[in-house]
Amino acid sequence: MPSPASNTWINTTLPSSCSSPFKDLASTSSSPTTLLPFKKRSSSNTNTITCSLQTLHYPKQYQPTSTSTTTTPTPIKPTTTTTTTTPHRETKPLSDTKQPFPQKWNFLQKAAATGLDMVETALVSHESKHPLPKTADPKVQIAGNFAPVPEHAADQALPVVGKIPKCIDGVYVRNGANPLYEPVAGHHFFDGDGMVHAVKFTNGAASYACRFTETQRLAQEKSLGRPVFPKAIGELHGHSGIARLLLFYARSLFQLVDGSHGMGVANAGLVYFNNHLLAMSEDDLPYHVRITSNGDLTTVGRYDFNGQLNSTMIAHPKLDPVNGDLHALSYDVVQKPYLKYFRFSADGVKSPDVEIPLKEPTMMHDFAITENFVVVPDQQVVFKLTEMITGGSPVVYDKNKTSRFGILDKNAKDANAMRWIDAPECFCFHLWNAWEEPETDEIVVIGSCMTPADSIFNECDESLKSVLSEIRLNLRTGKSTRRPIISDAEQVNLEAGMVNRNKLGRKTQFAYLALAEPWPKVSGFAKVDLFSGEVQKYMYGEEKFGGEPLFLPNGEEEGDGYILAFVHDEKEWKSELQIVNAQNLKLEASIKLPSRVPYGFHGTFIHSKDLRKQA
């Protein structure tokens, strides 16, 4: 084992079980040795954190991103021992010589930095005396294949079992959370730095690369060699959360950090719009990421649509397949207006903001569009920052609130004509589609209704359920109805997925959704007939788990296409990209990947003809 001062990876044996809603983060069969590319904080303190089975060591300094060829680390097969293996390093180690402070800092800033670091050390010491909730415990949240990986430069001509369909020509990209630095306190899986994984297809061959999205936040933390920005979910709860906000504010006053150019992680969604690939999280503007000719990735920068966007944008904008417009929401947890709607024409021209009146800031992760309307959920998970004063989480399930859906004309200039329809006890983290049925004057919304509603954010005793549901909003009566699409006998947790995006906002028969079992892992995907409730399942295989299935259309027929999904073998500790025929659910090809792909979030596919016009 190299010394803690060297640039090494973390080798840790992970526990095989965990008594939490995230208990399945670790392998259920054996304890694989995992490669975690955390970077150690630049500090004179001992750079270790203690896990249940082994101590994790972190390198002192960050190695800058490079697009040059890297050495691929050798995947480590699972083992039941705690033997430590040192893989090949991805980049040349840096010298141990480091600047204690950035050279541009003056004496006052250096003194302030020293004092505030002492405050943080005391805060961390105080926090360590209290157990973290499992939804904020890094030993739970980023265990197993939820753990981060290092960047990987484009690797060409990957091994393929089977044959890649000729129609798959372009690049599949998927976003995910991948913390660069060791968490110093609480950490939720959603808090990690954004990393995009890309598989590029050319003439039946495939390449793979993964890169951090170089956010303003990440750039500043790299320059300091440590995490300094507060983590929205893992850290900001209770009195310690208030202390961390004050600590960040103090560092900002002395210009040690700067949050004025964005604090987001860009780890959730991806959309290709107006020749720009955008990486998004709802706490910031999008980031423009460019795909290189050899399939690698580079970050161009924070993207404000040529000066038109000056607020955050949620990670699930909706691209209208007919006219090419991009529809989006922006929400604010501090000040009114708490919610805004806007759209961009196909050539990138933004509409004026439409302020949507809400009494309190609400979790607004997703929404839906129809041919003529925007469907906005106003649900029971809300933000109450005052809860931190009494020691609680600011993300709250408000049992006294009635969930509702707002229907707004896509071209509305204000929210005066917006109609609200109550939908009691309904919380959908994601909405898969919506369409209009003029014969009954209804809007049909397809979503997965989740209970407990706040279980992703707050520790709950009740096990999570995610029920695929049809919600009907009657514009004539102002009433709603809701029914499960799948029968009770076949009920399974369905989360993450999509319909044919060429049919978005129009009536669709099929949805392709992740089988989120055993939660929070994904053991396969389901093709669901939204009319009959019939479920066809495709399982990734024994000890294999994946994430969001991406449906790639191939023709005019709705169900004609292929499913692409990253899959990780927890027994062999290797990852692959599976390509499945969406009509018969037969495996067409499996692309063997040169490095591990952690479980992540959402993705998209960009065809080669569109890539050639990339900005």
From Swiss-Prot:
GO terms for molecular function: 9-cis-epoxycarotenoid dioxygenase activity; metal ion binding. Induction: By drought stress. It catalyses: a 9-cis-epoxycarotenoid + O2 = a 12'-apo-carotenal + 2-cis,4-trans-xanthoxin; 9-cis-violaxanthin + O2 = (3S,5R,6S)-5,6-epoxy-3-hydroxy-5,6-dihydro-12'-apo-beta-caroten-12'-al + 2-cis,4-trans-xanthoxin; 9'-cis-neoxanthin + O2 = (3S,5R,6R)-3,5-dihydroxy-6,7-didehydro-5,6-dihydro-12'-apo-beta-caroten-12'-al + 2-cis,4-trans-xanthoxin. Residues 1-41 form a transit peptide. GO terms for cellular component: chloroplast stroma; chloroplast thylakoid membrane. Residues 571-592 form a coiled coil. The keyword Iron applies. It is found in: Plastid, Chloroplast thylakoid membrane. Its EC number is 1.13.11.51. Binds 1 Fe(2+) ion per subunit. Residues 20-45, 62-101 are annotated as: Disordered. Keywords: Abscisic acid biosynthesis, Chloroplast, Coiled coil, Dioxygenase, Iron, Membrane, Metal-binding, Oxidoreductase, Plastid, Stress response, Thylakoid, Transit peptide. GO terms for biological process: abscisic acid biosynthetic process; carotene catabolic process. Fe cation binds at H316, H365, H430, H602. Its cofactor is Fe(2+). The keyword Transcription does not apply. Disulfide bonds: none annotated. It holds the Pfam family RPE65. PANTHER family: 9-CIS-EPOXYCAROTENOID DIOXYGENASE NCED3, CHLOROPLASTIC, BETA-CAROTENE DIOXYGENASE. Belongs to the carotenoid oxygenase family. This is 9-cis-epoxycarotenoid dioxygenase NCED1, chloroplastic. It comes from Phaseolus vulgaris. The gene is NCED1.
